């Protein structure tokens, strides 16, 4: 297992997991992504990635389809079984249409053939990390709202229900004997 990471203020931008059995591809992607201030974690196999994957990270996965051991499609299946919220960009030197269709139907966001256009990959990574950050903020707001609602007394919940139903303050006060 080979794991490299570059930690700094890049954590706020998000993490790019790169899983590929080809050293040259991993190094090339690390160079490209770190030059654009991303935190990059490199893995040489699906198994090593699965062992270290942090489901709480704001991240995107750049994943080779064909690797010895666990294939990229098997990694995707494993992540789906864990209900991981992780955008996957597949890269491959030997892809075919049925393979791409299968990956995309299972939720992959892109399927790119090697050699790939660096600008296109970088743009897709940026787009997916932005979406991941937005989803995280939305989920955090929803959790906060649910926690606040759970703290309401039964009477406060009834008042809130009437407000949501469009009742006027005066109508709510009359019904609840609220002054």
Regions found by a protein language model. Name each.
Residues 1-17, 23, 30, 144:
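Non-catalytic signal-transmission and effector/linker regions of two-component phosphorelay proteins
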